[in-house]
Amino acid sequence: MVFQNVALDSHEKIVFCNDDKTGLRAIIAIHSTALGPAAGGCRLWSYQSEEEALFDVLKLSKAMSYKNAMAGLNFGGGKAVIIKTEDFSNADEIYEKFGEFVDQFNGSYITAEDVGMTMRIMQLIARNTRHVTGLPKEGSDAGGDPSPKTSWGILKGIEAAVRFKLGKSELDGLTIAVQGVGNVGYHLCKYLSKVGVNILVADIDDNRVKRVIKEFNVTAIDYEDILYQKVDVLSPCALGSILNKQSIPRLKTEIIAGGANNQLESDQDGRRLFERGILYAPDYVINGGGIINVAAEYYGDADDDQVIKKVSAIGPRLNNIFKEAERLK
């Protein structure tokens, strides 16, 4: 088992977790522990190279520092990625070994569920560390799959953005495009379908699209085209870097408010959206519901109802951000 520590960028610690016996290849990045232990999910993805995985985990962990701070949590920013290889037949052993690596941080990194992960995987990780969340909850306790809370926060953020930009107090009759209908996108469609929204969806996984078509009144769009539909709100809930100098000129929306991390490919892309008059809800604010749930589960200081109340505050928080941005422009 190799535990290699390197220093890069402004991060406090980057650890390459390699284990020849199981085949585990993972990276854990701690961006900051200024506000508390670094907390952030673990992503399972088929990266083309270790360099690609490193680039991803560095951006994601830095974003977690902002997300946790904006949510008012006593957490710093961290993230982990597990590189999924072609031969992943011993996945359970890999997840358990990853738990050993997490435990070696002695609580300075707390892991959670992210893209590609499930509650069952988190339970396997928890066999070797207590510094893990997203475990099955009991009764009214906080915990479990964090994605419904993430989606609830996105809904509250969309409502705030619609009030600010469109002057509408209800979402009924609006058209919203949801890119990505995995855990977060699925629950967002569930919430939106209850308030009379016309929902367009797309995902690289056809089975996910079939699921939301079966359960909700949605319209499927080709994945390559979903960003460029004429809609009131675009809600990216897949992977990041989709807002860039190529895509932004083609957008036909007034609002972008979604759950994907690192939606802007570069800082300049925020300026490009501003120049086009598109209101952008910062991803590290609007998608903070999941980490709020993680904090309540880890510290045991809030039940499920209290978590919902805290997550609902994302709407007013974004409204204040929109007002301040308007004042400073």
Language model regions located:
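N-terminal ligand-binding/catalytic initiation module
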Residues: 1-140
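Conserved active-site and cofactor/substrate-binding residues in soluble primary-metabolism enzymes
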Residues: 48-56, 89-93, 97, 116-120, ...
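Buried hydrophobic packing segments
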Residues: 57-60, 154-162, 291-295
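Flexible, glycine/charged-enriched surface loops at secondary-structure junctions
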Residues: 68-73, 108-113, 166-175, 223, ...
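Glycine-rich phosphate/diphosphate-binding loop of Rossmann-like nucleotide-binding domains
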Residues: 141, 145-233
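Adenosine-phosphate binding glycine-rich loop
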Residues: 162, 254-329
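Rossmann-like adenosine-cofactor binding region
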Residues: 173, 206-281, 285
